[in-house]
Amino acid sequence: MVLRQLSRQASVKVGKTWTGTKRRAQRIFIFILELLLDFCRGEDSVDGKKKKDSLTDKTETVTEKKES
């Protein structure tokens, strides 16, 4: 009987720590995904402003030249 109680208590402790570990891992994973998303969008992580993309600037000028 005592062994059964001890094993249940141990499994509860392991379950709680595993839940905390999963939550922490999920938070880290979400942070990395958001960081990658910001990087792919071209936003600067320091001030949140978009960086100028030279490729889009070039395509805009080429498009403007074709229209006129």
Curated annotation (Swiss-Prot):
Residues 44-68 are annotated as: Disordered. The modification Phosphoserine is found at residues 7, 11. Phosphorylated by host PKC. Phosphorylation alters the stability and may also have an impact on the subcellular location. GO terms for cellular component: host cell nuclear membrane; host cell plasma membrane; host cell rough endoplasmic reticulum membrane; membrane. It is found in: Host cytoplasm; Host nucleus membrane; Host rough endoplasmic reticulum membrane; Host cell membrane. One of its GO terms (molecular function) is channel activity. Pfam families: Polyoma_agno. Disulfide bonds: none annotated. It comes from the Viruses. GO terms for biological process: monoatomic ion transmembrane transport. It is a single-pass type II membrane protein. The chain crosses the membrane at residues 25-41. Residues 42-68 are extracellular. Keywords: Host cell membrane, Host cytoplasm, Host endoplasmic reticulum, Host membrane, Host nucleus, Host-virus interaction, Ion channel, Ion transport, Membrane, Phosphoprotein, Signal-anchor, Transmembrane, Transmembrane helix, Transport, Viral ion channel. Signal peptide: none annotated. Residues 1-24 are cytoplasmic. Homooligomer. Interacts with VP1. Interacts with large T antigen; this interaction may impact upon the activity of T-antigen on the control of viral gene transcription and replication. Interacts with small t antigen. Interacts with host CBX5; this interaction induces the dissociation of CBX5 from LBR, resulting in destabilization of the nuclear envelope. Alters the structure of the nuclear envelope by interacting with host CBX5 and disrupting CBX5 association with LBR. Involved in the perinuclear-nuclear localization of the capsid protein VP1 during virion assembly and maturation. Plays an important role in the release of progeny virions from infected cells and in viral propagation, probably by acting as a viral ionic channel in the host plasma membrane. Allows influx of extracellular calcium ions in the host cell. May contribute to viral genome transcription and translation of viral late proteins. Belongs to the polyomavirus agnoprotein family. This is Agnoprotein. The lineage of its organism: Viruses, Monodnaviria, Shotokuvirae, Cossaviricota, Papovaviricetes.
